[in-house]
């Protein structure tokens, strides 16, 4: 029997405790879970890709079956096929997230009918945390320590020094 391999993707700009919770829970469902940082190289992100990847790798180092990868200009289903993933993992905070994700699920299934999508609901304590909300707080100099993993906080601090 082959390994169960999953893929959880996002821009993680920055990664939040909500993302980490989904990763930890999904890691228990798969033999191998890839966390894919998908980014647009033509768009200026808040945190450079290297910082996002380094912070994410540190945040998940306690999960032996999780590997962080990055991609650009590729469809999620193509990356999933390349990695041998048969399941995409998506986190949901609310009905709007479900509606948004369902449209991608439709196209992904049309492109590759053997790849399934599973949805994990956010824990109540993470329902209102978003990367855009964290970026907004940072813009106004607010403390974000309770919204992001320590490793991400370190990357943001290091980036601000430069």
From Swiss-Prot:
Q: In which pathway does it act?
A: Cofactor biosynthesis; coenzyme A biosynthesis; CoA from (R)-pantothenate: step 4/5
Task: Give a yes or no for keyword 4Fe-4S in this entry.
Answer: no
Give the enzyme's main class according to its UniProt record, as a single word.
Answer: transferase
Localization annotation = Cytoplasm
Cofactor dependence? Mg(2+)
Molecular function terms, GO-annotated = ATP binding; pantetheine-phosphate adenylyltransferase activity
Binding-site positions, ATP: 11-12, 19, 91-93, 101, 126-132
Q: Which BP terms in the Gene Ontology apply to this protein?
A: coenzyme A biosynthetic process
GO CC aspect terms: cytoplasm
Residues at site: Transition state stabilizer? 19
Known catalysed reaction(s)?
A: (R)-4'-phosphopantetheine + ATP + H(+) = 3'-dephospho-CoA + diphosphate
Q: Quick one: which residues bind substrate?
A: 11, 43, 76, 90
- Write down the superkingdom of origin: Bacteria
Q: Which UniProt keywords apply?
A: ATP-binding, Coenzyme A biosynthesis, Cytoplasm, Magnesium, Nucleotide-binding, Nucleotidyltransferase, Transferase
Reported EC number(s) for this entry are 2.7.7.3
Function text: Reversibly transfers an adenylyl group from ATP to 4'-phosphopantetheine, yielding dephospho-CoA (dPCoA) and pyrophosphate.
- Tell me its family: Belongs to the bacterial CoaD family.
The UniProt subunit note reads as follows: Homohexamer.
What name does this protein carry?
A: Phosphopantetheine adenylyltransferase
Organism of origin: Streptococcus pneumoniae serotype 4 (strain ATCC BAA-334 / TIGR4)
């Amino acid at each position: 029997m082959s390994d169960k391999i999953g893929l959880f993707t996002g821009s993680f700009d920055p990664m939040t405790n909500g993302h980490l919770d989904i990763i930890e829970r999904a890691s228990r469902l798969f033999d191998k879970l890839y966390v894919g940082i998908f980014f647009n190289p033509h768009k200026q992100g808040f945190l450079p890709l290297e910082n996002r990847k380094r912070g994410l790798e540190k945040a998940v180092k306690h999960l032996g079956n999780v590997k962080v990868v990055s991609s650009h200009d590729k469809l999620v289903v193509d990356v999933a096929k390349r990695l041998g993933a048969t399941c995409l993992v998506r986190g949901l905070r609310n009905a709007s997230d479900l509606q948004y994700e369902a449209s991608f699920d439709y196209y992904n299934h049309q492109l590759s009918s053997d790849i399934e999508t599973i949805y994990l609901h956010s824990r109540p304590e993470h329902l209102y945390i978003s990367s855009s909300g964290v970026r907004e707080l940072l813009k106004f100099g607010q403390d974000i320590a309770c919204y992001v993993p320590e490793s991400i906080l370190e990357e943001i601090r290091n980036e601000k020094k430069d």
